Each structure stands twice: as structure tokens, then as C-alpha cells.
Amino acid sequence: MSFRHFKRRLDTSSADESSSADEEHPDQNVSLTEKSASLSHSDLGGEILNGTGKNRTPNDGQESNESDGSPESDESPESEESSDNSDSSDSDDMRPLPRPLFMKKKANNLQKATKIDQPWNAQDDARVLQTKKENMIKNIDKANQVAKNYETMKLRLNTNYSTNEELIKQCLLLDDNDEVDSEKERQKWFERQNERKQKHRRIQLAKQRESEEYEAKRFEAMQKGKDGNTKYDVILDKEKEKLDHKKQRSAEKVEKSHNNNRYKITRTKNVEFGDLGKNSRDYEETEYSVI
């Protein structure tokens, strides 16, 4: 056992010396590796031939293995270290290359390639012309639609800006400077106010005449069919009269409140000019309505 331990220490020291020598002389390492490989092959062949003997004892085999294993153990680490050094030198010399990228071919290129391979016919020409015509028609229709939309938007803008343009011009032409002759302007304002009151009175009289005519016709119809009327019909008529009276009173209250609050200074809510025509429903009476 002591002999084997001493033998291993010698092997390790020889391996360190060989590695230092290999680092200093890399060219000699290559030749040493080749020699060690040839020696290992020859030793293996000798062992195989010696192992075929019949009168060989197990103790002799162990001693022979120990004696034969010493050169192999001496040479095997040298060969491994020399191969490692050669690999490291080769790896230092090699430069890292970028990874190749394979681009995918587009379907259009494949179609073009197939079309080039195929023979060209008159039908293909007709088909190409037809597709060109269809594309041209589509582009023309699209351009026409865009122009039409532009015209409609332009008309809408013009109509929005031109509403009540005449009324705006008349309002701008009015002389609202009261500092020149304040008394005269005040007198004109009273005249306009009286005209508005008379106009409102005429409208109310027309409504009153219409309601009186309706009541007169209703009274005549009641007198004609008085015998056929029942108690239930009379009650309905009375309730209807009460409702009409309530409606009339509520309308009078609204008119009074409107007359009282008509000329109060309030904050403007709608800046846009409305249609103040006589036939319109949203007709409002103001001091400029007489114009």
C-alpha cells in the first residue's frame, strides 16, 4: 500500500510538470499526445496477448496489471491535459460568428415565381386588363364619394352661418345710440310699447270671439237636444265648464306674470338668433319685432 501511495504522488508531480511544459511548448504537446496514443494502443495489445495464457495465476495477473498500469497512468493524464490545452488554443483562435437568420419568402414573390414559370396566354392579358379596369372604377367611385361628402359638409356650414342673415343685418343697421337725443328715443320707445300692447290686445280679442262663438254654438246644440239629454250628460257639461274656467284663469295668471316680468333685465341664455317670423310658433314680441 505504501508503494502504491508513493507511486501516485510521483504520477501527480509528473502531471504538473508536463502541464507546465505543455503551456510553454504547445507544438511539442501535439507530438507527445500522438506518441502517448500509440504507446497506449501497443500496451493494450500486449495485455490482450498476455491475458490469453492458460497457466497464468490471479496473483501474477494483479502484479502484471500493477506493473503495466504504471506507464499508462503516467501517460493518460498527460494526453488529457495536452488535448485540453489544444482545445483551449483552438477556441481562442476561433471568433464567435453571428447566428444566421432565415427570412421567410412572401406569398407574392412565390406567386410571381409560379407565374413566370407558366406560359403567358391571351386570357391572362384579358384578365389583367379586367382587374386594372375594376381597380380604376373603384378608385373613381371612391374619389367621387369623397367629393360629394365634401360638398355636403360645405353646404351645411354655409347654411349654418347664413341663418337669419337678413335679420342680423337689420339689427346691425339700427341706431341704438341714445346719447344723441335721449328724450326722442324715449318717446319712440313708448310708441313701440303701445303698438305691442295693442297687438297683444287684438290677439286676445280674437281668441275671445272664437271662444264665444264656440259657446254660442254649444248652447244652441244643448237647446235643440235638451229633451234627449240625461242627468249624466249635464254633469259632464258642468265639469267641462269648470275645467274651462280653471284653464282660463291659469292663462290669465300666466299672461299677467309674463307682462310683469317681460322687461326685467336677465342674463342671456341662447346667443343664437331664432326665427322671429310672424308665422313661426316661437314668435316673441320684443321692441325690434315692429320692424
UniProtKB/Swiss-Prot annotation:
This is Pre-mRNA-splicing factor SPP381. Belongs to the SPP381 family. The keyword Ribonucleoprotein applies. The lineage of its organism: Eukaryota, Fungi, Dikarya, Ascomycota, Saccharomycotina. One of its GO terms (molecular function) is RNA binding. Component of the U4/U6-U5 tri-snRNP complex composed of the U4, U6 and U5 snRNAs and at least PRP3, PRP4, PRP6, PRP8, PRP18, PRP31, PRP38, SNU13, SNU23, SNU66, SNU114, SPP381, SMB1, SMD1, SMD2, SMD3, SMX2, SMX3, LSM2, LSM3, LSM4, LSM5, LSM6, LSM7, LSM8, BRR2 and DIB1. Interacts with PRP38. GO terms for cellular component: cytosol; nucleus; spliceosomal complex; U4/U6 x U5 tri-snRNP complex. Its main location: nucleus. One of its GO terms (biological process) is generation of catalytic spliceosome for first transesterification step. Residues 28-41, 52-62 have a biased composition (Polar residues). Component of the spliceosome and rRNA processing machinery. In association with the spliceosomal U4/U6.U5 tri-snRNP particle, required for splicing of pre-mRNA. Residues 239-258 have a biased composition (Basic and acidic residues). It comes from Saccharomyces cerevisiae (strain ATCC 204508 / S288c) (Baker's yeast). Disulfide bonds: none annotated. Present with 2510 molecules/cell in log phase SD medium. Residues 63-91 have a biased composition (Acidic residues). Residues 1-99, 239-266 are annotated as: Disordered. It comes from the Eukaryota. The gene is SPP381. Keywords: mRNA processing, mRNA splicing, Nucleus, Ribonucleoprotein, RNA-binding, Spliceosome. It is found in: Nucleus.
